[in-house]
Amino acid sequence: MKTIIALSYIFCLAFSQDLPGNDNSTATLCLGHHAVPNGTIVKTITDDQIEVTNATELVQSSSTGKICNNPHRILDGRDCTLIDALLGDPHCDVFQDETWDLFVERSNAFSNCYPYDVPDYASLRSLVASSGTLEFITEGFTWTGVTQNGGSNACKRGPASGFFSRLNWLTKSGSTYPVLNVTMPNNDNFDKLYIWGVHHPSTNQEQTNLYVQASGRVTVSTRRSQQTIIPNIGSRPWVRGQSGGISIYWTIVKPGDVLVINSNGNLIAPRGYFKMRTGKSSIMRSDAPIDTCVSECITPNGSIPNDKPFQNVNKITYGACPKYVKQNTLKLATGMRNVPEKQARGLFGAIAGFIENGWEGMIDGWYGFRHQNSEGTGQAADLKSTQAAIDQINGKLNRVIEKTNEKFHQIEKEFSEVEGRIQDLEKYVEDTKIDLWSYNAELLVALENQHTIDLTDSEMNKLFEKTRRQLRENAEDMGNGCFKIYHKCDNACIESIRNGTYDHDIYRDEALNNRFQIKGVELKSGYKDWILWISFAISCFLLCVVLLGFIMWACQRGNIRCNICI
């Protein structure tokens, strides 16, 4: 019986010890930062996968699917190519004297006049597209001794045979075709674009029927250039009932220069000139519909927003557009390192600081305090450190956009077959530029993300050190982002620590006294586990002894009989 009483006393003594830190003479103050249940993964210089509370996508990966007609003037080519509109194909007459910022060519565009080719098609197309106008001025060329305004059934204008409206097909008059020698000076202060051509008959009979001479010749000159073309007579694939063809050429006459045309046959003469303008107009092949909306950036896929620094919708763009990169996604960290809060905090609901985990539910700030004292628990944000971090992060996105947005258009590149090697080289250069920009973009974002995370970590450390300097010897760093305060610290006291008005001298004596007392209790209570295990072992031993003694006593009295057989 004495043993049982002694063991009961030991158990009661062990569990009657006060839990350190749970009395009214101490308090706990923890510092922490905002956290979310599911963060966003970003890349930094040192880590390919680091979780942050918030991030902004930097790559625009989709278009609106339509081309906006504002603020750029969009001219829909419909079923006409730009060159057909330039030459005056009958079904493209609606484009005469039109202007544009962006001419949109459709995949269903077709020619509906006499068969032609342009030896330097891409250059002429680009030249006219960048001029942004089809403004045409008719001039009084004098063509003596020939028949003008030739036409063809392949180029009907209404029910009658016709021809390109900007060109004049000259044929023999009677049985003669004299040598033509015409000059046209440029007395204006702008460049003039003259379009002319050479007819290639399908047979020698057609050649003499139209031009008398068995072989014609066309020479067009300025002070800066000269082109001489000899017709190539021969049958070609039939197009709209014709096996002949026309080659289209062009000449630019500078102010003060003179255009000279010399020919003895096969001349497709100009009727005037196109007024050349300088600007940033362009052309784009696209089947996206044109709609009434606003967008600064246009791609063949449709307009895209330019509020992001990068895009991977299309390499071809017009306007102020994000830079094209290969990556589908690049995320810019706009929040701090995310460490989700641990849900289980022990039997007594202990709180922990930023070293263990972040705090979810902090909607009024990025950094803050949690406390546990005689009045309960509480939480408050630290607005000063929060604002310091936000001020430095804000503007990151705009700065990246300013560094990368193109203020010009990336035109389509076209080359003739004979320029295949140049095309291959140009493609290699463009691909290299894209690779370089893609690498630079990833590096730039990784650097910015590293800076953001280091910055937010630094603000947390600054707040922790500021609190440590206030508390001094009145509290002990618990190693998890918390301080154990060794004096009674009510809510007013906690608030003074948060706002920086805490006076450690007021509580110094109380803190020192409590520190020594609590340390002593903690030292004694450190043997509690040993006492419990020893008590348990002794109890088990005594129970076994009592049970064995009972069995032996019963056997002696005859109450229990034990037979052993061999």
UniProtKB/Swiss-Prot annotation:
SUPFAM superfamilies named among the record's database cross-references: Influenza hemagglutinin (stalk) (SSF58064), Viral protein domain (SSF49818)
GO cellular component: host cell plasma membrane; membrane; viral envelope; virion membrane
Lipid-anchored residues (S-palmitoyl cysteine): C555, C562, C565
Chain ranges on the Extracellular side, renumbered to this chain: 17-530
Location in the cell: Virion membrane; Host apical cell membrane
Residue positions with a glycan: N24, N38, N54, N181, N301, N499
Regions crossing the membrane: 531-551
Post-translational modification: Palmitoylated. In natural infection, inactive HA is matured into HA1 and HA2 outside the cell by one or more trypsin-like, arginine-specific endoprotease secreted by the bronchial epithelial cells. One identified protease that may be involved in this process is secreted in lungs by club cells.
Primary localization class, coarse: virion
Topology versus the membrane: Single-pass type I membrane protein
Keywords recorded for this protein, A-Z: Clathrin- and caveolin-independent endocytosis of virus by host, Clathrin-mediated endocytosis of virus by host, Disulfide bond, Fusion of virus membrane with host endosomal membrane, Fusion of virus membrane with host membrane, Glycoprotein, Hemagglutinin, Host cell membrane, Host membrane, Host-virus interaction, Lipoprotein, Membrane, Palmitate, Signal, Transmembrane, Transmembrane helix, Viral attachment to host cell, Viral envelope protein, Viral penetration into host cytoplasm, Virion, Virus endocytosis by host, Virus entry into host cell
Disulfide bonding pattern of the chain: C30-C482, C68-C293, C80-C92, C113-C155, C297-C321, C489-C493
Signal peptide start-end: 1-16
GO molecular function list: host cell surface receptor binding
Any Pfam family matching the protein: Hemagglutinin
UniProt-listed InterPro entries: Capsid_hemagglutn, Hemagglutn_HA1_a/b_dom_sf, Hemagglutn_influenz_A, Hemagglutn_influenz_A/B
Record's miscellaneous remark: Major glycoprotein, comprises over 80% of the envelope proteins present in virus particle.
Functional description taken from the UniProt entry: Binds to sialic acid-containing receptors on the cell surface, bringing about the attachment of the virus particle to the cell. This attachment induces virion internalization of about two third of the virus particles through clathrin-dependent endocytosis and about one third through a clathrin- and caveolin-independent pathway. Plays a major role in the determination of host range restriction and virulence. Class I viral fusion protein.
Similarity remark: Belongs to the influenza viruses hemagglutinin family.
Record's subunit section: Homotrimer of disulfide-linked HA1-HA2.
Protein name, per record: Hemagglutinin
Provenance organism: Influenza A virus (strain A/Duck/Hokkaido/8/1980 H3N8)
Originating gene: HA
